[in-house]
Amino acid sequence: SGRLKGMINHQLWEKLFGGEKNIFLIEDVHNPLIRMGNCCFPIPGDKISGFIFEDKEIEIHHSNCKNSFNKKNKVPVGKIPVEVAWSISEKLTQQHILHIQVIDGAGILYQITKIIKDAGVTIINSETAAKQNNYADIRIEIESITWPVFHKIVEKLRPLKFVKKIQEEASA
């Protein structure tokens, strides 16, 4: 972070990192300067790590993602590792859209919607589309809920064998 600190003026550094702690707090997942890793799709509540690119964008990964920075991985060229943490109110509610890529099969939509229903959350809309190579895309719009409730739903969906990718889309 020493190199990065030299690149940013002192007042901006204090505002971004809160002094000498060097932790970037993420308050908005839809901030255009923040991009979520396309490999692991972290959401608030996940343990995360991050990189700052030379263009000042911050890329966030699960802390256990193969592309995250840890003592075993070398830092990729053009990336500066930075400590990151979620700073999103646990009381903030918002509508969420889940985009789930699955291996297609019987009963998959039922299993996914059951997890959402069991969390006490209402599904507003859902769309499915069959893709090539036995894959399907499922898009589910759910009612306004807090990030912790959303995180619990995603944590129950991630381990399902047929789920290949889950991400949260920005709702309109």
Regions picked out by a protein language model, each given a short descriptive name:
Residues 154:
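A glycine- and charged-residue-rich anion-binding loop/surface
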Residues 114:
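Extracellular/lumenal glycan-associated surfaces
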Residues 135:
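RNA substrate-recognition surfaces in RNA-acting enzymes
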